């Protein structure tokens, strides 16, 4: 039997609720401590991708950094309904540069 990973999104209600329609497991968190605990808990529960709003991620950089060195789960930062802080884009830029040895963005 093939292992199927789940997808989760963590953030404030207004930013993440629409993901439920797509079949993504939604975890509504309001502060950094709760977000940190939620990420650590669901990372152990067969989630392959965890989307986190940039608004929360900016307050838990050590947790995000810890999971960036892991293959699974992939923690991906997304803008909240308040707009982008460009943290996610910056991380993608760094990963692309690391992978190909040149900055392209």
Curated annotation (Swiss-Prot):
Pfam family for this entry, one: ATP-synt_F
InterPro entries according to UniProt: ATPase_V1-cplx_f_g_su, ATPase_V1-cplx_fsu_bac/arc, ATPase_V1_fsu_sf
GO molecular function: ATP binding; proton-transporting ATP synthase activity, rotational mechanism; proton-transporting ATPase activity, rotational mechanism
UniProt keyword list: ATP synthesis, Hydrogen ion transport, Ion transport, Transport
Listed GO biological process terms: proton motive force-driven plasma membrane ATP synthesis
Similarity section: Belongs to the V-ATPase F subunit family.
Name by which UniProt lists this protein: V-type ATP synthase subunit F
Source species: Fusobacterium nucleatum subsp. nucleatum (strain ATCC 25586 / DSM 15643 / BCRC 10681 / CIP 101130 / JCM 8532 / KCTC 2640 / LMG 13131 / VPI 4355)
């Amino acid at each position: 039997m093939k292992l199927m990973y789940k997808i989760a999104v963590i953030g404030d209600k207004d930013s993440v609720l629409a993901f439920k329609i797509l079949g993504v497991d939604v975890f509504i968190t309001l502060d950094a401590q709760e977000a940190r605990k939620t990420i650590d808990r669901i990372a152990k529960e067969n989630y392959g991708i965890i989307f986190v709003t940039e608004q929360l991620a900016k307050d838990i950089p050590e947790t995000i950094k810890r999971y960036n060195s892991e293959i699974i789960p992939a923690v991906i930062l997304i803008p909240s309904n308040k707009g982008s802080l460009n943290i996610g884009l910056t991380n993608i830029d760094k990963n692309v540069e690391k992978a190909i040895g040149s900055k392209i963005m």
